[in-house]
Amino acid sequence: MNDFMYYNPVRVHFGADAMSHLPEELGKFGANVLLTYGGGSIKRTGLYDRVLDALRAAGKSVYELSGIMPNPRTEKVYEGIELCRKHKIDLILAVGGGSTIDCSKAIAVGAPAEGDFWEKFYVNWESAETGIPLGVILTIPATGSELDKSAVITNFATGEKNCYDSEYEFPRFAILDPTLTYSLPKNQMVNGIVDTMSHLMELYISPPDDDFLTDNLAEAAMRTEIAAARRSIVEPTDYEARANLMWTSSFALCGMLNNGKKTDWESHCIEHPLSALFDVAHGAGLAVVHPAYLEYICESAAPRLARFARNVWGIDPAGKSESEQAKEGIAALKKFFHEELGAPATLRALGVPESCFARVAELTDLSCYSYQRLTADDVIEILRRCY
């Protein structure tokens, strides 16, 4: 187990009654609030009106930034920064999933900073000195952004999708009501399940192998996600299933499962250029890339993948080598993603052309910790295998 420092200051209100705590949280901040959200779904479900009523009852002046898309763009961040500076925003309230939250985080650290937020934080990785307070009302369990200090932003002009970490990007509070997920389309739920599983696997399938508590927690989280996903797909309003999906996605990135691990984010690093270049849904891209990546490193990571097969998928090890167990575990993962959930299985199905592979490899961060350090040629081969 490696040395670590653990810190997570997010106050979480979880449950069917979680929204009742919004007024008390709003009372802790100043009068000017920037409300951020995506498309029209929160208006169709009535959530927008509930939030607006709470803001008005709290005496807040509300300014809005709507239309935040999946793979949130730099353009929306710039727009939000301008609104924050113009109206002297005291609190950003993000209502939605990871895209809305990440865009809001980038705005939170970008608005008080001098210079261009992209160059300052996402290219030069300068440390943020302060940030506008952020609150979250989660509607899509997927990214875990409601409990972490990271924000992923896409620059379509350069074809880059980069991540920035800062303690000023931790939300001050997060409201997690599983009933808010009942109306999600199946494809959004599936993408969220895949993203959560990918986070858990990247934390777990990484050295060292002697971090027993963290690894056991990760295995339990993966088994929970799989079981809850199967129930939720059959019955979208199964509260216990939705509650477990929501809490597992948050738990995956709250920092607990990083403790003592080096972590291997290579699948995310390969997928990010696909989203940046072709606007691929993040979870859909991971459903294709992550199993192919595990197949590629299977021999190097055989002991860990064999444990993954036994303890997560229930593979019987009798008479099988670690390599054979590992392959059966990956096969079980692919069946879950592609057959049970119906997630895409190939890059071709996502509309990604084979001609882009060299460019994707060029944009892929190869600095991740792994059982097998990749080169650009390795990335190209992985992409070919899942085409």
Question: Where do the model's predicted regions map?
Answer:
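ATP/NTP phosphate-donor binding region
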Residues: 1-91, 347
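A glycine/threonine-rich phosphate-anchoring loop and its flanking beta-alpha core
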Residues: 10, 20, 112-216, 307
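Short glycine/serine/threonine-rich phosphate/pyrophosphate-binding segments
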Residues: 19-22, 44-47, 74-77, 99-105, ...
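Short Gly/Thr/Asp-enriched flexible loops that form oxyanion-binding sites at enzyme active sites
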Residues: 51, 81, 100-114, 147-148
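Glycine/serine-rich anion-binding loops at beta->alpha junctions
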Residues: 89-105, 139-145, 277-280
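Active-site segments that bind and position negatively charged phosphate/pyrophosphate groups
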Residues: 203, 207-332
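C-terminal charged capping/lid subdomain of soluble metabolic enzymes
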Residues: 312-387
